[in-house]
Regions:
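Long, low-complexity, intrinsically disordered terminal regions
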Residues: 1-376
């Protein structure tokens, strides 16, 4: 890994160099070699404007084509939102904002490993990819994750779509809906899907044959909203002859599932424990009037595992039996985590981006960053 740049304040030089050494050590596990960056020093107590001005000088106005930048923040980590927003939305360069208090503590190597995962994803590297069945491959599926995060004043909506057959390349968009305009929320997804279909076509020279939409941030009780959002999506897909599923994702379920075992060494005494990763529940506790299922994607060693509920609110694909396995496969390939997560990678990424959008009031992503995962 070379041709990168690191910004820091002069009083933090020793700490930032230790961080670089730890990053280099952590990279051994990935068989990477990290060359030393170009160091750019700022005065102590520099404002967010000073950081942005210096960053633009090197990354936007300069002649060097740096692959990415790290901003190392000491006690001034309150400027994190401004740096994140500027790099993602204004001038569109790939960056990693590092808070000193996160890396200067026990477990620094572990933190650096996670940072390397993020950097790898931001630069387009593939840590994991899904290998789907041939029958699924023929469907040319585009998976989409949509999440809404709410504050008292606004709603942040993020939409992430896969645009390759291993579900590891993405087209992204986020939007801010102010409280007084919240009725516009139901039209966001359909307009995004049109853009995502075009991005898929640009990359693959054809449009997807089917779309699976994972929707979080909306409940079954919001029937009017759901009906209108699905209607808008249906109109877009119908004009392009694309079949789709619209699946509500609920991680806040009250059910717990356990596996029963018999202890042969103790006269067959029964005991219960968390299920292995991949538990699928299709009946018994599901809604009989709808296609609904529960998946326990992770194996939990402490406490009790909470499954995720997937409720199919609409679908016109002819093979619904492939949906649970496809969903479980996507839980394995979230770029920002080593292992499985509770929800498919597209919805996990949308969850992260929607929270950032609502909290930091992000504008539209820079055109250069609408594909990829620069927001991680």
């Amino acid at each position: 890994m070379s041709n990168w740049i690191c910004f820091y304040e002069e009083s933090n030089y020793d700490d930032v160099y230790d961080f670089y050494l730890n990053l280099s050590k952590a990279s051994d596990a990935y068989n990477l070699k990290i060359l030393e960056p170009e160091w750019v020093k700022l005065k102590n107590k520099s404002s967010a404007k000073d950081w942005i001005k210096k960053a633009d000088e090197f990354l936007y106005e300069g002649q060097n084509d740096y692959s990415f930048a790290i901003f190392y923040l000491g006690k001034n980590d309150y400027i994190y939102p401004q740096l994140k927003k500027h790099s993602l939305c204004n001038n569109g360069y790939i960056s990693q904002v590092v808070k000193a208090r996160s890396v200067n503590k026990k477990g620094a190597l572990s933190v650096c490993s996670k940072i390397l995962l993020q950097i790898n994803a931001k630069l387009g590297g593939i840590s994991y990819k899904a290998v789907v069945d041939k029958d699924v491959e023929k469907l040319k599926i585009m998976a989409i994750g949509v999440d809404s995060s709410h504050t008292s004043k606004r709603t942040g909506v993020a939409m992430i779509a896969t645009i390759n057959d291993s579900y590891t390349d993405f087209y992204n968009k986020e939007d801010i809906i102010e409280e007084e305009n919240k009725s516009q929320l139901q039209f966001c997804v359909s307009s995004f899907i049109e853009e995502a279909i075009q991005a898929y076509k640009n990359k693959n020279k054809e449009i997807p044959k089917s779309i699976i939409i994972y929707r979080q941030g909306v409940s079954l009780q919001q029937k009017t909203f759901l009906k209108e959002e699905i209607k808008q999506i249906e109109e877009v897909c119908k004009t392009k002859n694309i079949l789709f599923y619209y699946i509500l994702v609920n991680t806040k379920t009250t059910f717990k599932f356990f596996e029963k075992y018999e202890d042969e060494e103790n006269e067959g005494e029964e005991y219960y424990c968390n299920p292995e990763s991949g538990l699928l529940i299709l009946d018994g506790v599901t809604n009989r009037n709808y296609f609904e299922f529960y998946i326990q994607p992770q194996y939990v060693t402490e406490g009790s595992a909470t499954p995720t509920c997937f409720h199919v609110a609409y679908g016109n694909l002819n093979n619904p039996e492939m949906i649970p396995k496809f969903t479980f496969d996507l839980c394995h390939i979230y770029s920002n985590w080593q292992g499985t997560v509770r929800i498919p990678n597209v919805i996990k990424a949308a969850e992260k981006l929607s929270k950032m959008t609502a909290k930091y009031k992000l504008g539209e992503l820079n055109e250069e960053l609408k594909e990829g995962q620069a927001y991680l």
